[in-house]
């Protein structure tokens, strides 16, 4: 079963290849003279060259995640390569090394270990271990501290900032050119697909606001580092996310800080990888001492450790921005609960605002690769349905059904599991991004809202990847 989202697995019919067959990245091979009659044998623990002079173990070829992001040879390269920096094995290795340094008293080399947990994995793990969501957050925090975490954070502050930045970006774009549809940017599977498949045509439509994961990266490596009095490079920042595509996002060069000399997010592990780590130890979450989620950002702390955002399960972009734009642009109040109308399938829905008999705002939510393809093709043909904003997620049902969420139990359908997670989500307290926490972050860290610093740290850019027509890309 593929681990990455549909948008990363497939573009055109001729696009699905694996690196072991046709990856176009050149690998430097040191040529050595060997005697005639040498042969290569493969054993369980590696590759060996056997000749009259004896056996020699050959070096393993490694292609990093960054190689795949910079390569237009295929959209699925990341599935078949050795992901050297985005795995539970690498995470556990770093944690063990850090514990050894602490034990030896080598404090100059010890790193501060920070974990950030997204809400969707909490839902998945709560369901898996039959816990309440808040309960699951405390047990998971306890488990991570047992592994060596110094801080365990939630994404609430970054979720709030992402909504505030994205809504302001939409209003500014609408006032400048109401005809240009704006597409959300928080899904890395969608962004990577857009860069590699539709390039310069689609990229101007995509919001520049960073995803909550990458906003957390900035806050951890800069604001938290400042509060702790350590350089950002001395913090190891790991996130727990609902999909493997987040590993690709963390590996983008755009999110490497020259100031800190490190990535904003060092490692991404997923819901299912947490489950695997627990299974390897023959443990469950309930077996660890519960611990509180940390809140190092502001003077006051939120009442709850875990929050929902609007009614949608992928951050609430369409709903929140629609409400804000209706009031900001047209002085129209909207209901607390918006009713999106499902169209051909449950993963594509829309809502509109009418004023004086005219449709002044039209928003949509497009989940899943099929709906993304249809949306992009309509935009390309100039026959789009006139959406001003579309919340785009590569996974059917959005982030709550991310490709790295814990799998259904035997006999349970994915849709049934998704509905159960949705019910858990609806029970969470609803966060309003216009709160004292975000206001303090803007004042103390970002020099205010809509400033050069907030634009630099909370926004990003995209890069069209040109298709390379090489012999390796030709299908016969």
Curated annotation (Swiss-Prot):
Residue sites binding [4Fe-4S] cluster 1 per the record: 23, 68, 71, 74
Name this polypeptide is given: Probable cytosolic Fe-S cluster assembly factor GJ13047
Family: Belongs to the NARF family.
Biological process per Gene Ontology, one example term: iron-sulfur cluster assembly
Residues that, per the record, bind [4Fe-4S] cluster 2: 187, 243, 395, 399
Protein task: Component of the cytosolic iron-sulfur (Fe/S) protein assembly machinery. Required for maturation of extramitochondrial Fe/S proteins.
PANTHER family associated with the record: NITRATE, FORMATE, IRON DEHYDROGENASE
SUPFAM superfamilies per the UniProt record, alphabetical: Fe-only hydrogenase
Classification via Pfam families: Fe_hyd_lg_C (PF02906), Fe_hyd_SSU (PF02256)
Keywords recorded for this protein, A-Z: 4Fe-4S, Iron, Iron-sulfur, Metal-binding
Keyword Cell wall biogenesis/degradation: no
Lineage, broadest ranks: Eukaryota, Metazoa, Ecdysozoa, Arthropoda, Hexapoda
Annotated organism of origin: Drosophila virilis
Single GO MF descriptor: metal ion binding
């Amino acid at each position: 079963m593929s681990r990455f989202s549909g948008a990363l697995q497939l573009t055109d019919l001729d696009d699905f290849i694996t690196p072991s067959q046709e990856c176009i990245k050149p690998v430097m091979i040191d040529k050595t003279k060997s005697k005639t009659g040498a042969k290569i044998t493969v054993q369980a623990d590696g590759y060996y060259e056997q000749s009259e002079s004896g056996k020699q173990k050959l070096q393993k070829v490694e292609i990093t995640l960054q190689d795949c992001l910079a390569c237009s040879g295929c959209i699925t390269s990341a599935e078949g390569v050795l992901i050297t920096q985005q795995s539970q094995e690498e995470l556990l290795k770093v944690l063990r090394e850090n514990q050894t340094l602490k034990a030896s008293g080598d404090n100059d080399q010890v790193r501060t270990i920070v974990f950030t947990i997204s809400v969707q994995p909490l839902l998945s793990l709560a369901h898996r271990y039959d816990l309440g969501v808040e309960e699951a957050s405390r047990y998971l925090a306890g488990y991570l501290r047992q592994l060596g975490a110094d801080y365990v954070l939630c994404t609430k502050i970054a979720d709030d900032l992402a909504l505030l930045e994205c809504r302001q970006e939409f209003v500014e774009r609408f006032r400048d050119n109401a005809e240009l549809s704006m597409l959300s940017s928080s899904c890395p599977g969608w962004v990577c697909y857009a860069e590699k498949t539709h390039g310069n045509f689609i990229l101007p439509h995509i919001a520049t606001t960073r995803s909550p994961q990458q906003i957390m990266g900035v806050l951890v490596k800069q604001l938290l580092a400042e509060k702790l009095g350590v350089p950002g490079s001395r913090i190891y920042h790991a996130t727990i996310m609902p999909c493997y595509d987040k590993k690709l996002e963390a590996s983008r060069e755009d999110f490497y800080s020259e100031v800190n000399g490190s990535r904003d997010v060092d490692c991404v592990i997923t819901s299912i990888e947490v489950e695997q780590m627990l299974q390897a130890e023959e443990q469950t979450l309930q077996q660890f001492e519960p611990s509180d989620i940390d809140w190092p950002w502001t003077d006051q702390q939120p009442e709850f450790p875990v929050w929902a955002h609007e009614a949608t399960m992928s951050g609430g972009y369409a709903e929140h921005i629609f409400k804000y734009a209706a009031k900001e642009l047209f002085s129209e109040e909207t209901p607390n609960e918006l009713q999106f109308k499902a169209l051909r399938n449950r993963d594509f829905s829309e809502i509109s605002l009418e004023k004086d008999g005219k449709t002044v705002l039209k928003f949509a939510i497009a989940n899943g690769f099929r709906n993304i393809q249809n949306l992009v093709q309509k935009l390309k043909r100039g026959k789009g349905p006139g959406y001003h904003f579309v919340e785009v997620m590569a996974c059917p049902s959005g982030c709550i059904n991310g490709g790295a969420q814990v799998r259904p139990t035997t006999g349970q359908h994915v849709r049934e599991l998704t509905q159960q997670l949705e019910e858990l989500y609806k029970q969470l307290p609803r966060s309003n991004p216009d709160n004292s926490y975000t206001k303090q972050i803007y004042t103390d860290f970002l020099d205010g809202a809509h400033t050069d610093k907030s634009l630099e740290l909370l926004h990003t850019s995209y890069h069209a990847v040109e298709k390379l027509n090489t012999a390796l890309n030709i299908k016969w």
